[in-house]
Every structure is written in C-alpha cells, then in structure tokens.
C-alpha cells in the first residue's frame, strides 16, 4: 500500500516533520531521538492487541506473547535501576504521577512539591493540574540568592504544612538533588516520599546521578527524555507496595496498556543496559556543561544556579530586551529549537517567561561534542544580540545547516 497516495495530507505533514528534525538543532531538554529498533517495536503488530491486566493475569485471551514482551520490559527496568517493583504500563509521566498519588494518598490530602517557577512540574501540585485540583497543594522553591534547593527551608515548610506526601524532582532544575535529605524530612513529618526522576532517569541509569530508588517510597519517570525510549511512563517502588500501585494504574487510572509502546520500552531498556549507553550519558553531561559555561560567561545572560550537574540549564534572559517566548520564536527562525521557561522569582506570565530551557540529550544522540555545543551556544547568543539583523540571522541559519549536515539523524 502506498501510504503517501492514500493519505497525502497526513504523510506530507509527517515528511515535513522529519525534515524539520533533520535540519533543526533540537535543544528541548525533554526530547531525544530514538533508535530504529524502538520505532519498529512501537510500529509493530502489538498495537492490535488488548491486554487489560498484568502478565499472567489478563482479562483477555491470546496474551501469552504480550506477557513475554511486558515481562521483558519489567525485568530490564528492574536490572537498570535495581528496583524490587516496576510497572511499565503508565501511558505517560503524568499518568504515572496520578497513579502514584492514588496509591498512597486520598483526594483532599496534601502534596508538597516544587514550585513551577523554581523548576517543578505541573503534576507536582500546580493549581491548573489534577494534582492541585483533587489534592491540597503547597510548594517549596529555591534560595533566591543561590537559586538552589534550600533543604532547611523545605523542612520548615513541611513541618508547618504537614503534607501526606512530599514530591522531589523537577522539570527544569540543573543541580543534583539530595534524596536522603528529602527522606529525612518526609520521615520527620510522617509523609510518603515520591520522586519524579523523569528528566534524569537516563543519568541515574548510567550511575551519573544519585538514584532515588530504594530511598523514596515510590519513583516515577518518563521513558523518553534522557532514557531515550518511546514516549511513556513507568513506576518503580518496593515489592510491599506492588498491590496498591498495580491497582492504582489498572483499573483505577487506566484501561488497556499500550503494549506496542511497552515493547518499545523494552527495546530502550535493553539499550540502556549496554556499555555504550553510559558513554552517551557522559557526553550528555560534558555537552551541557560546555554550553552552560558559554552562557554564564556572557555579559548579558545568566544560567540559573550558575551552571549544571545534569543535561539541562535554564538561561535567564532578564539582562536582554527579550522574553522567553520572543527568544524561542527568534531561535525557531534560525532552526534552533528551545522552549520558554520560568525563572525563580518569575515576574512574567507562563506564556512569556523570563528564560529559556536548553538540554543536550538530542544533539548528543546526533553526535555533537563539546566544541560543537559551544558553537551552538555562541550562535544562540549571537541571535539574541542581533534579533533585528536579518543578515546576521541568515548567517546563523547557514551555520546551523552545516552542523546538522555534519551530524545527520541516522
């Protein structure tokens, strides 16, 4: 069947997106480029199969091979993270978080999570999210001077608010997080500790960031981002919580699992168990540090916290005449993809923001090294300082094209 002739409108859009990915420098910290094997598994005949339940306990017949696939994903994830319990069925990180809350607390209970402006995620208690609608939510931020987590202040808030669950983890925080300090605070107030490691899961898998598994009561993650798998979620915990977590995923929050996506997760987990994966993650860190140094050394830009310990950074734009949305659009115009991001003590709306978030997982997958990343950072600075100079912007486009031609997506 010729799909392009059967549905040209759809396939034209897909082809244009493929070209965009090929010719743009992708710096969105939550995006990556999966292997052909991951894509093939996700596009397999497993998409045809319903499989409500869990391996060995399905509500439908004909699941014997589906069980093998899902068990492979579970076993590989357990091996990667040294986890007693793994659930690979969550459709997304948000679904994993919803299930984790449902397993440990009840509607109306209190969540203590990281404030959005400090780098937290919507599902950590933001009022516009289910986590701030079905539950009471309070937040902690970062120290205004250092822009880093202040564990004494988090403890003070926890003692005052007495939450039922404390959420550690972030979507835009560039420093190591001390899981043990969060554990101590949670124990002191009698709260469960939940860690959302969606952004850093690949670094944790490679042993390059401290692991929360075995410290937190429950750990959630996405399977894309640094883990370089398909878009999806996962929950890790202790065996003693298996029954309540399984129930919270199915039937409480989801129906049939996406077994074609779970197969792709199994592929990605297999890749993460290979020595090359650690080499890749080390380069992700080197590239991020190289970019952060360029931005921090510039006269009008500032990297929140002054640098990075992981794959991302938030660049503070308050020293420029542009906001985050304007810089995002400006960089889109020169084929560099970023996203607007709030900074600590943010004064602008979430639709404008005072910063941009930058990450290195996708460009590292393409093969970029430190010098390439320094060049990209300098191109970004040049674009910001020449936002109205079409001649300079055209030169930047040509330089971007040279880099993407040098490192094509396989």
Swiss-Prot record:
Q: Which UniProt keywords apply?
A: Amino-acid biosynthesis, Cytoplasm, One-carbon metabolism, Pyridoxal phosphate, Transferase
Cofactors demanded by this protein: pyridoxal 5'-phosphate
The protein's predominant localisation is cytoplasm
What is the name of this protein? Answer: Serine hydroxymethyltransferase
For this UniProt entry, the molecular function terms from Gene Ontology, in alphabetical order, are: glycine hydroxymethyltransferase activity; pyridoxal phosphate binding
The entry's localization annotation reads: Cytoplasm
Q: Name one GO cellular component term.
A: cytosol
Q: Which EC number(s) are documented for this chain?
A: 2.1.2.1
Pathway listed for it?
One-carbon metabolism; tetrahydrofolate interconversion; Amino-acid biosynthesis; glycine biosynthesis; glycine from L-serine: step 1/1
Gene Ontology biological-process entries: glycine biosynthetic process from serine; tetrahydrofolate interconversion
Gene3D superfamilies in the record: Aspartate Aminotransferase, domain 1, Type I PLP-dependent aspartate aminotransferase-like (Major domain)
Q: What class of enzyme is it?
A: transferase
State the source organism's domain of life. Answer: Bacteria
The record's PANTHER family line, in alphabetical order, gives: SERINE HYDROXYMETHYLTRANSFERASE, SERINE HYDROXYMETHYLTRANSFERASE 1
Ranges in a coiled coil: none
UniProt modified residues of type N6-(pyridoxal phosphate)lysine = 225
Q: Which family does it belong to?
A: Belongs to the SHMT family.
Q: Where is this site: Plays an important role in substrate specificity?
A: 224
């Amino acid at each position: 069947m010729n799909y392009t002739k059967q549905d040209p409108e759809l396939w034209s859009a897909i082809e244009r997106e493929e070209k965009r990915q090929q010719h743009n420098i992708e710096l969105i910290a939550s995006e990556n480029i999966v292997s052909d094997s991951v894509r093939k598994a996700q596009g397999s005949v497993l998409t045809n199969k319903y499989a409500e339940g869990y391996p060995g306990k399905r509500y439908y017949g004909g699941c014997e091979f589906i069980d093998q696939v899902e068990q492979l994903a579970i076993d590989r994830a357990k091996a990667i993270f040294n986890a007693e319990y793994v659930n690979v069925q969550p459709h997304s990180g948000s679904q994993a978080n919803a299930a984790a809350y449902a397993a440990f607390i009840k509607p109306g209970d209190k969540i203590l999570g990281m404030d959005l402006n400090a780098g937290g995620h919507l599902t950590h208690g933001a009022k516009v999210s289910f986590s701030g609608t079905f539950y009471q939510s309070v937040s902690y931020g970062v120290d205004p001077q250092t822009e880093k987590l202040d564990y004494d202040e988090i403890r003070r808030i926890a003692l005052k608010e007495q939450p039922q669950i404390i959420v550690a983890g972030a979507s835009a925080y560039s420093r190591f997080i001390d899981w043990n300090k969060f554990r101590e605070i949670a124990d002191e107030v009698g709260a469960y500790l939940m860690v959302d490691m969606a952004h850093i899961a690949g670094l944790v898998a490679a042993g390059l960031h401290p692991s929360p598994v075995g410290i937190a009561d429950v750990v959630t993650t996405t399977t894309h981002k640094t883990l370089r798998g398909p878009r999806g979620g996962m929950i890790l915990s202790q065996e003693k919580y298996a029954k309540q977590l399984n129930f919270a995923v199915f039937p409480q929050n989801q129906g049939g699992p996406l077994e074609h996506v779970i197969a792709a997760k199994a592929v990605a987990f297999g890749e993460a168990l290979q020595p090359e994966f650690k080499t890749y993650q080390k380069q992700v860190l080197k590239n991020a540090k190289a970019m952060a140094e360029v931005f921090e050394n510039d006269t009008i830009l500032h990297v929140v916290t002054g640098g990075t310990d992981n794959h991302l950074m938030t660049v503070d734009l308050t020293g420029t005449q542009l906001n985050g949305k304007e810089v995002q659009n400006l960089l889109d115009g020169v084929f560099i993809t970023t996203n607007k991001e709030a900074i600590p003590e943010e004064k602008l709306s979430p639709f404008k923001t005072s910063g941009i978030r930058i990450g290195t997982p996708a460009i590292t997958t393409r093969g970029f090294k430190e010098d390439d990343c320094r060049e990209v950072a300098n191109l970004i600075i040049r674009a910001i300082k020449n936002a109205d100079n079409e001649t300079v912007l055209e030169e930047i486009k040509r330089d971007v094209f040279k880099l993407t031609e040098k490192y094509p997506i396989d």
